[in-house]
């Protein structure tokens, strides 16, 4: 309907044009991974909202540079709503995002990521021209890589990767003695640097 799918990886990992079936399957996989990444990272007060706000800000800047002002409005609107929510979500949190919130944030960010892959910034003079795929991965690095790492650790240990556990990076930082605010702040900084 809206042609929201990744049909070309623009040379990243040597992948270019995808067939219609491959594009549909890969896009579905990407959407599920991003949605679950944000759901799984929502284990510390303020973390999912802050990372979502940062990601939506970066996607907003990207879409401004791409001249997609309507998508930029969506990105900055998500950022604004998450920043307003964040005021009440820091420890001790008065409201919680929950699954409903983290799944919606993940869904919106997955659409923004697909848009950046499909129409990303084009630099003709550098290796592969469209940097959209790499930018999307960079903007969502913490939830994506944390989920991947947790799934691999759980599988290696013979555990079901879909069951809850304390293998996430935010749990490791809490176990080191960082509180909720410092854990969230450290991961915000890491996400910004990536």
PLM regions and their residue ranges:
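Asparagine-centered polar/low-complexity signal
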Residues: 36-39, 89
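Structural signature of hydrophobic alpha-helical transmembrane segments
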Residues: 14-28, 67-80
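Membrane interface segments of multi-pass transport proteins and intramembrane proteases
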Residues: 8-18, 178-179
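Alpha-helical transmembrane segments
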Residues: 48-194
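Transmembrane alpha-helix boundary signature
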Residues: 2-13, 117-120
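Membrane-embedded alpha-helical core segments of multi-pass
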Residues: 2-5, 26-36, 52-58, 79
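Juxtamembrane loop-helix boundary motifs flanking transmembrane segments in multi-pass membrane proteins
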Residues: 17, 29, 36, 161-169
